[in-house]
């Protein structure tokens, strides 16, 4: 079953789903990520201008992106329930454009951006992002992405220019087990 077809459960501090076979919770996003999301948003917005956010989740990074001096904020989200939350969140935010769909399926409808933040769950095309990332970026644009590992083991295969190291204290979850988070940074020239 694809992620976009799963029934998600939203509460104040998490998004998760229950695996039908194992009956285990699979966490999609949790509120302990705030400082990571702020750092990603601040880097993605470091040039101002037009920002592309792939994945909305709980809207944590979107809130931080909106706190920056930006021109536009395009959000691509594949899960219909998360997209509905994004539409509600974007009400009265005229610089926000929400696109329902997988980034790979809508890639030719996207423009050029000064900054990009990629953080999705269950993206079967994630490893292809490295091939398309340059086509989304303006000259001197910057990109960052969720990194579940470390600076030597980047699951997307994108070569970062540098990393910021953030101390974290993750709650019990099934997607991040470390006390240090390596935030990847990439500039396009």
Predicted segments — roles?
Residues 1-49:
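Class I SAM-dependent methyltransferase Rossmann-like catalytic core
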Residues 58-70:
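Conserved SAM-binding loop of SAM-dependent methyltransferases across substrates and taxa
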């Amino acid at each position: 079953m694809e992620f976009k077809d799963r029934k998600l459960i939203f509460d104040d501090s998490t998004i998760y789903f229950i695996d039908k076979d194992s009956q285990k919770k699979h966490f999609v996003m949790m509120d302990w990520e705030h400082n990571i999301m702020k750092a990603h948003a601040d880097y993605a917005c470091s040039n101002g201008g037009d920002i592309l956010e792939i994945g909305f989740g709980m809207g944590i990074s979107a809130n931080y992106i909106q706190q920056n001096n930006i021109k536009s904020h395009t959000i691509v989200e594949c899960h219909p329930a998360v997209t509905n939350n994004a539409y509600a969140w974007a009400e009265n935010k005229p610089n926000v454009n929400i696109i329902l769909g997988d980034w790979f399926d809508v890639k030719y409808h996207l423009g050029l951006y000064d900054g990009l933040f990629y953080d999705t769950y269950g993206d079967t095309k994630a490893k292809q992002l490295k091939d398309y990332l340059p086509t989304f970026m303006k000259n001197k644009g910057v990109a960052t992405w969720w990194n579940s590992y470390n600076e030597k083991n980047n699951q997307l295969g994108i070569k970062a220019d540098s990393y910021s190291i953030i101390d974290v204290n993750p709650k019990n979850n099934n997607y991040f087990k470390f006390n240090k988070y390596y935030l990847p940074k990439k500039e396009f020239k």
